[in-house]
Amino acid sequence: MQIESSYLGSIDIDVKKILQFPAGLPGFAEEKEFVILEIPENPMFHVLQSVHNPNLAFVITDPYQIYTSYTFELDDYTIESLQITSQEDVAVFAIMTLKEPFHKSTINLKAPIVINMKKQLAKQYVLNLDEYSSQASIQSPPLKEGE
C-alpha cells in the first residue's frame, strides 16, 4: 500500500503493519490507523505516521534507550483493550518534540505510546505519575548523587 508522509514522502507500507488506535490519539480521535516508519539515517528514531493524513506524523523513540529506569504499570482496562497476554508482545515509544538545536529536543514520558505488536493494537497511555514529564530531555538523565 502506498501512503504519503510529511517526513519521508511517498512510501510503500505493509498493510499487516498498520497499527489500530481504537480511540485515536488525544486531540486526533478520528485518526485510528498509523504505521511506524524507519528513519534510514538514524535507527534510534522512527515516524508514527497516520495512514490517511500525510500531515499527521510524530517522531518517536524507544524511551528506554535514554531513560533506562523508566517504568510504569498498565491498568486492567488497557491490558484488556489492547488484548495483551504477554509483556514480550508490548512495545513502548515516546513522542518527541523536535527543537533547534536538536539536543534541546524532548520526549513525552507522561503519555507513552503502548503497542501490542502481535495484535497491532495501540494507544497513547496517559500516566498519573508526577515523576515523569511530558517534556523530558533527550540528553542522558543526570546520575543521582553517589552513582
UniProtKB/Swiss-Prot annotation:
Its main location: cytoplasm. Signal peptide: none annotated. It is found in: Cytoplasm. GO terms for biological process: bacterial-type flagellum assembly; regulation of translation. Keywords: Bacterial flagellum biogenesis, Chaperone, Cytoplasm, Translation regulation. One of its GO terms (cellular component) is cytoplasm. It comes from the Bacteria. Acts as an anti-CsrA protein, binds CsrA and prevents it from repressing translation of its target genes, one of which is flagellin. Binds to flagellin and participates in the assembly of the flagellum. PANTHER family: FLAGELLAR ASSEMBLY FACTOR FLIW. HAMAP family: FliW. Belongs to the FliW family. Interacts with translational regulator CsrA and flagellin(s). This is Flagellar assembly factor FliW. It comes from Oceanobacillus iheyensis (strain DSM 14371 / CIP 107618 / JCM 11309 / KCTC 3954 / HTE831). The lineage of its organism: Bacteria, Bacillati, Bacillota, Bacilli, Bacillales.
